């Protein structure tokens, strides 16, 4: 009887501890969300890369959510449950900071608790017109019918800000259309609008996946370096180039344009579990950065693993900042300590390879 009772108790304890262990394992996996951008934009691909190459190795199940863009992302990061990360354009973030500084209480409530993880890459600003348009340069868009992107998108912020900087006035209400990127291009082709402003990192899936026949009906406007409007736009935006190599079956030459920086943003969390998960995310980001650059969207090749100084009203998230700085320092120390590897040609008896050795794959043996 005693043996039977002890066996039963042992079974109960085993069941209890196995259940507890299983529950502990489940609890260790964090289920977070990141808000990105439109379905065919660059942001959503960057979010997918972070989920695969950074969050997953850190034990975080990161769901990648589409959105209208940066302004909506700020709001969702601030108020939507489960959203722990967001991709945000620098001009949108700065607009919130400026409005808060000017006394807008709602802007202050929204932006003050947000913190940066790190800057990412520059996003090109495309000014798209029909191929038969008489316009050649960006400073010619005054008084034209323009789609500036969806309300809540970073594109809308960039488009309206650039117009105001260049021409000293807002776009007239009757000339503004708030269309998605796809709808804007469709409206452009059927002549319902004159210009579509689109913000996306090159190569943008929106254009690379576009029907080749439709693609031949549109082109990009260029920055005129000598136009007075260009000098005024430089107050906020930076010169950039849309490379023909990004769209080799379409563009015949590079196109000068403007750019805006993308940032990875979080909230000033202080709950122990969340802080711990985001620390692991930071460690994984540093450790797997090479995978992002080699396996992710081409824009990752432009990202530098560094934390530059920030302007007033901008702050890094301290727990992540500490981990990233420590990891960056370790990487730098390792690179300094490692001797420079000889080139393939120098590996053959310390002399350059001959043409014959190269042909026979004898270099580097």
Residue map of PLM features:
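Bilobed "Venus flytrap"/periplasmic-binding protein-like clamshell domains
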Residues: 31-55, 123-190, 307
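N-terminal (or domain-start) structured segment
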Residues: 27-91
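Pocket-flanking alpha-helical
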Residues: 63-107, 185-187, 204-211
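Segments of small-molecule ligand-sensing domains
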Residues: 255-365
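A structural signal for short loop-to-beta-strand junctions that line the ligand-binding cleft
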Residues: 106-120, 125, 247-255
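Extracytoplasmic
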Residues: 29, 41, 57-59, 69-72, ...
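Bacterial N-terminal signal peptides
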Residues: 8-19
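Pocket-lining segment of extracytoplasmic ligand-binding domains
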Residues: 90, 133, 169-274
